[in-house]
Structure formats: structure tokens, C-alpha cells
Swiss-Prot record:
Name this polypeptide is given: Ribose-5-phosphate isomerase A
Role, per record: Catalyzes the reversible conversion of ribose-5-phosphate to ribulose 5-phosphate.
Pathway field: Carbohydrate degradation; pentose phosphate pathway; D-ribose 5-phosphate from D-ribulose 5-phosphate (non-oxidative stage): step 1/1
Gene: rpiA
Keyword Isomerase: yes
Similarity comment: family membership: Belongs to the ribose 5-phosphate isomerase family.
Group of enzyme by EC: isomerase
Subunit structure: Homodimer.
Length: 218
């Protein structure tokens, strides 16, 4: 089974958690694209979706799924999204696709976070994947200096503007042994919109695509 086939297995397995008549929180990325395709197969059974990115919104609309504004929804039953890394405590690094802030917002209004990944995303310690930080453009240099003080090696993601009009710093060489503490520290830097650590709001369910099919941990 290829890596993409494992992603597909995880994406389709997440349909188990979609309630009839519900509005579904939808993340961003290659694994989520498989979930969106799966959602299209039951589009008449759901009310619609709240999307975390322009890219996911376009894909949902192409499949005929109604997309609601986040401000028009009080609470979602589930949010389905991928991760760049996930540890045993279900804390994650996300934001490789630059949608981290909107992903955090949709996760915050969801009762259950279902994380869909392939087996390559599981790690013992977070930080091998560069940690994305969304930053107000005028604060980029200042935030980079502050991230160096925290032991990181930040790199400006050239040519990338987020859906919110901001920039991304990718922080390399971090051994993140206390994700919640680091999430708080980075979010406390002036000019940071949010950091791609999902530690305070980790995953409730992890669906991993494996060569044998989807493995579900609740």
C-alpha cells in the first residue's frame, strides 16, 4: 500500500464519526482531501461543512457540499484534520500547509477532534518537522529573534502568504519535550498570530492509515 493509499484509508475511515444532519469541521491537506472526497459520497446526509482554508472550501464546493462561515456556527460535533507530527499524548505539529490559525479556530469550536494521518507522522518527540508560526508581517524579524532565544532556528517561508494575509516562520531544530509550555510561550510573543502546536487542544481520536488499513485509537 502506498503512502497515499494509507492516507485514503484514514480519510475514508473518518466517515464513521460523521453524524447525519450535522455540520462537519474540515481541515486542510493531502489526507484531508481524501476525507473531503469521502464526505462527498454522503453529502445528502449532512447539512454542510465549516472549512479551515480556501483550498478545502473550493474542494467542498466542487463536490456540492455547502460551506458555512465559522461565525455562523456555535459548535461543531467533529473536526477532521491531519497533522505533520503527532506524539503519544495526541499533541501535534500542524501548519505545513499554512492554514494553522484557521485550523485552530475550527478545532476550538468542535466537540471532537479526529486526527487522520499515515504512519509516518507518529513521533516520540515533536520537533523534527519544522514548527510553523503565523506572524503579522511587520513583526517578522522581532518574532524570529525571540524564537532564537527559545532555542529554535526560524526560517522565513518565502513566497507564502496565509489566507489571513500573514507570513510563516518555520522553526527548525526544536526538541519539544513540553509542548503545552512552548505553545504558551510562542503565543505570548507580540506579533505572533498563533503557533502550529496543537497541545492544549490535542486530538480526541487518531485514525492512522497503515498497510493493513485504518487503525483507530479513541
Amino acid at each position: 500500500m502506498t503512502q497515499d493509499e494509507m492516507k485514503k484509508a484514514a480519510g475514508w475511515a473518518a466517515l464513521k464519526y460523521v453524524e447525519k444532519g450535522s455540520i462537519v469541521g474540515v481541515g486542510t491537506g493531502s489526507t484531508v482531501n481524501h476525507f473531503i472526497d469521502a464526505l462527498g459520497s454522503i453529502k445528502d446526509d449532512i447539512k454542510g461543512a465549516v472549512s479551515s482554508s480556501v483550498a478545502s472550501t473550493e474542494r467542498l464546493k466542487e463536490l456540492g457540499i455547502e460551506v458555512y462561515e465559522c461565525n455562523d456556527v456555535a459548535m461543531l460535533d467533529i473536526y477532521v484534520d491531519g497533522a505533520d507530527e503527532i506524539n503519544a499524548a495526541r499533541e501535534m505539529i500542524k501548519g505545513g500547509g499554512a492554514a494553522l490559525t484557521r485550523e485552530k479556530i475550527v478545532a476550538a469550536i468542535s466537540e471532537k477532534f479526529v486526527c487522520i494521518v499515515d504512519g509516518t507522522k507518529a513521533v516520540d518527540v515533536l520537533g523534527q518537522f519544522p514548527l510553523p508560526v503565523e506572524v503579522i508581517p511587520m513583526a517578522r524579524s522581532y518574532v524570529a529573534r525571540e524564537l532564537v532565544k527559545l532555542g529554535g532556528d526560524p526560517a522565513y517561508r518565502e513566497g507564502v502568504t496565509t489566507d489571513n494575509g500573514n507570513v510563516i516562520l518555520d522553526v527548525h531544530n526544536m526538541q519539544i519535550t513540553n509542548p503545552k509550555e512552548l505553545e504558551d510561550k510562542i503565543n505570548g510573543i507580540a506579533g505572533v498570530v498563533t503557533v502550529g502546536l496543537f497541545a492544549h487542544r490535542g486530538a480526541d481520536v487518531v485514525i492512522t492509515g497503515t498497510p493493513e488499513g485504518a487503525k483507530i485509537e479513541e
